[in-house]
């Protein structure tokens, strides 16, 4: 049931609002039900429309399925994140491609010189991470839209993950996300949210 004070101006169905926002939680435990490549493909085909500056789309996703790869990832997680990452049916490493500009001639074709805007390495890396994080938020919503739960974490050794999974040095790990159906005691009690008047000002 919707808990919104008012949804008069929202066109999305109340059930969808609840699925994506009000009733969605960060899961810490999962069932054994597998998450298929087809599910992830459908999620991506939905969330690929997230807005990014100059359509740069720097997010890259590594699906960790193999036992050896999972064990390697777990080694780089903080202790409280190790058990949930070991047991989740699927874990994804979300990273920023620091060479996203190589794709700009394809994805931003009306500006043939767009790639040149990002010649500076530091500026390009900052833009890659910023825009990839926008895509991360959309990816989490896409997981929820598929009826799954997401457990995003930034409690890990990012340098270690980069060395393990991106040894070429052109990607920067941002978030690790466990994905699946929520298991027993999957979440803590809902923490308070700031209210509208605490966040929004008009000038």
Locations of the language-model features?
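N-terminal amphipathic, basic helical "cap/leader" segment at the start of enzyme domains
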Residues: 2-101, 200-203
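Small-aliphatic-rich amphipathic alpha-helix that forms the alpha element of a beta-alpha
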Residues: 47-48, 92, 112-164
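Short secondary-structure junction motifs
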Residues: 56-59, 145, 174
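Short, well-ordered secondary-structure micro-motifs
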Residues: 72-74, 103-105, 186-190
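Residue-level signal for well-ordered alpha-helical positions
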Residues: 76, 106-107, 164
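A glycine-rich helix N-cap at a beta->alpha junction
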Residues: 82-85, 91-96, 167-188
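Short, flexible, mixed-charge acidic loops at enzyme active sites
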Residues: 104-113
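C-terminal domain-closing interface element
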Residues: 182-203
